[in-house]
């Protein structure tokens, strides 16, 4: 979802408008602000944000080549999204666990 109707801090009225705009989607880009990601768990939310950022980074890098992009069809994108959502292993939980292990070793102050 894309949210262009920023009306101030996300207190009651604004948060209701934002929630309605998000609907059942996992991501919402807030115009001139940033992104909101959701998930049923913290791991899913983190995973969603991480891969959204990676996709955006890859897209910007591809654009910087000034070459024609070979973008997959909407059907293939939907199929891939469904396959990832139905993957039999909880990769989001595993990924967050591994990130925390790295942080525990390299940046232990993150817990404070």
State where each predicted segment sits.
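Hydrophobic N-terminal alpha-helices or hydrophobic patches in metabolic proteins across all domains
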Residues: 4-7, 24, 43
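Short, conserved beta-strand edge motifs with alternating hydrophobic and charged residues
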Residues: 3, 29-33
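A general structural signal for well-ordered alpha-helical packing
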Residues: 15, 19, 46-49
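A conserved C-terminal secondary-structure "cap"
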Residues: 26, 34-112
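Crotonase-fold acyl-CoA enzyme core
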Residues: 16-30
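Class I SAM-dependent methyltransferase SAM-binding "motif I" and its flanking Rossmann-like core
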Residues: 1-9, 14
């Amino acid at each position: 979802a894309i949210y262009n109707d920023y009306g101030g801090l996300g207190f009651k009225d604004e948060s209701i408008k934002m929630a309605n705009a998000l609907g059942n989607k996992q991501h919402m880009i807030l115009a001139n602000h940033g992104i909101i990601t959701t998930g049923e768990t913290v791991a899913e939310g983190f995973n969603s944000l991480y891969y959204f950022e990676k996709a955006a980074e890859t897209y910007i890098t591809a654009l910087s080549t000034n070459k024609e992009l070979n973008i997959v069809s909407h059907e293939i994108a939907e199929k891939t999204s469904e396959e990832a959502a139905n993957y039999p292993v909880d990769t989001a939980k595993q990924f967050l666990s591994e990130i925390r292990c790295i942080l525990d070793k390299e940046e232990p102050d993150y817990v404070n």
